[in-house]
């Protein structure tokens, strides 16, 4: 093996953090390389560790350790990059209580009723009031697995660079799903003036909700591409520049002075029939307010394997994390009932 373990861990972290579609060069050591070059180097190095069954059996604990260290370092950073605009993300040691300290502003003390929505047992979401200035986010184990066919492995058609990529993507999507579930679960707890449902996009309804959220600070709109594409003012108000922006981007990135943040969308499975994020919801959240989503990572990632009867292997990964939402009466929700999560 040309690289020692610490160098291989660094390489794996660099590859896992990189954007495969970007043309930029990434630093490794004292040189810069393209993503394709780094990824191919990682594949070559891992083949030297597990290119045959005997090598895999000899080195699997080293491989698992590399995967664990990579996930522990890269996953929180990826989550931060994607969700930091509306989520607070912290990492805790195993056994430490994930505690988030709440910033209580004068207006919050005067007007904001605070409560927390978290995941309960059997997927039931519980709502309870927040006492004091801290909240604890309970964590639980989230798992992902990548199956490696024994013959595919021996033939070299599957390698551990693929395994790492599949696991990272799966854990990231699991977090995204939990965020969406937690946000959806808060809607029933909001007061009636802070939420509205329409069959389509109604400009006056959105303006009313923005006015409520803006009384606590300039608000930002968070929604999927599908929802953003419907947010078009009355025809008489559309300028040529807005038409060009809509044509080029598919949506307007600014609605009457308020930024529109488009959330990533994907499908639950390969059938492409059910979306991960329900596109009918838009969340209007004041900038500078407490970020409503709290994400806690606890302890180290654990990687192990399970051998099936056909000798195929499942590389299983467990990571403890928790997602909760802190809801105040400065958050508003618009539901466009014309949009559905199913196709």
Question: Model-found features: residue ranges?
Answer:
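N-terminal alpha-helical "arm" segments
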Residues: 1-56, 340-343
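Assembly/oligomerization interface modules of large self-assembling protein complexes
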Residues: 57-142
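Short, flexible beta-strand-to-coil junctions
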Residues: 73, 77-78, 82, 225-227, ...
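Alpha-helical scaffold segments that mediate packing/assembly in large oligomeric complexes
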Residues: 141-216
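Sequence/fold signature of self-assembling virion shell proteins
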Residues: 2, 43-54, 237-343
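Extended, solvent-exposed, turn-rich assembly/linker loops in the middle of proteins
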Residues: 185-256
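Surface-exposed polar/charged interaction patches
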Residues: 14-21, 48-52, 56, 69, ...
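Short, charged/polar micro-motifs that form catalytic or ligand-binding hotspots
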Residues: 53-57, 61, 65, 150-161
């Amino acid at each position: 093996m040309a690289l020692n373990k610490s160098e291989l861990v660094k390489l794996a972290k660099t590859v896992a953090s990189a954007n495969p579609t970007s043309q930029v060069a990434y630093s490794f050591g004292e040189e810069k390389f393209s993503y394709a070059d780094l990824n191919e180097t990682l594949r070559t190095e891992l083949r030297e560790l597990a290119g045959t069954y005997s090598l895999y059996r000899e080195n699997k604990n080293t491989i698992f350790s590399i995967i664990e260290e990579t996930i522990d370092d890269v996953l929180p950073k990826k989550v931060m990059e994607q969700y930091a605009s509306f989520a607070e993300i912290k990492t805790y040691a195993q056994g430490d209580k994930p505690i988030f300290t709440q910033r209580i502003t004068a207006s919050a003390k005067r007007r904001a009723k605070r409560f927390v929505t978290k995941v309960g047992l059997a997927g039931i979401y519980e709502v309870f009031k927040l006492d004091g200035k801290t909240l604890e986010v309970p964590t639980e184990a989230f798992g992902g697995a990548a199956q490696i066919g024994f013959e595919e492995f021996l033939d070299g058609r599957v390698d551990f660079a693929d395994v790492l990529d599949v696991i990272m993507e799966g854990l990231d999507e699991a977090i995204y799903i939990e965020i969406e579930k937690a946000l959806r679960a808060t809607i029933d707890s909001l007061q009636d003036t802070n939420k509205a449902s329409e069959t389509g996009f109604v400009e006056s309804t959105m303006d009313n909700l923005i006015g409520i959220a803006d009384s606590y600070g300039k608000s930002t709109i968070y929604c999927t591409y599908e929802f953003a594409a419907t947010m078009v003012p009355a025809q008489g108000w559309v300028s040529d520049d807005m038409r060009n922006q809509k044509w080029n981007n598919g949506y307007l990135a600014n609605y009457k002075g308020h930024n529109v943040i488009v959330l990533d969308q994907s499908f639950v499975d390969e059938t492409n029939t059910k979306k991960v994020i329900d596109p009918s919801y838009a969340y209007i959240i004041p900038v500078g307010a407490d970020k409503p989503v709290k994400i806690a990572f606890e302890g180290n990632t654990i990687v192990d394997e399970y051998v099936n009867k056909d000798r195929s292997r499942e590389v299983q990964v467990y990571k403890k994390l928790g997602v909760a939402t802190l809801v105040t009466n400065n958050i508003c929700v618009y539901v466009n009932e014309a949009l559905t999560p199913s196709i």
